[in-house]
Amino acid sequence: MNIFMVGDVFGEPGRAALKKLLPRLRRQHEIDVAVVNVENAAGGSGVMPPMIREFLDAGADVLTSGNHIFKKKEIISAIAKENLLLRPANYPPGTPGSGYVTMKAGPYRVGVLNLMGRIFMEPIDCPFRKADEIVPELAREARVILVDMHAEATSE
């Protein structure tokens, strides 16, 4: 299985590069699943709803995020409807959107889990405890589990 993960796509130059390169990279490397962190796609902070379709049309399968996901208020209603745009799973209960998804990629089912670290970040639930809770659930549905850990410290 060939996996492509990239982040953070930053602003218009990052969006343009991804739109230009991802289709070719998918063909050239026979990529089965492409996960793209988009939390800084709107001018370096946040993401706007129309960008979701741009990324998916360019070949991204799942969009992940981090602490800037809700910087643009317009994303709140979009993230509640779009299950391929993830926010960190360790955000408090009741936060719009989901922190994980499963999907078919070639012959496999793939789970993608989005977590956020706590060092040098705003207070949030423990990502490791949240992973311990969610990974077994994903493992019941998916043979492959990818984790996007958005963090400031490599120790996390």
Label each region the model flagged.
Residues 1-156:
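Acidic, metal/ion-coordinating pockets
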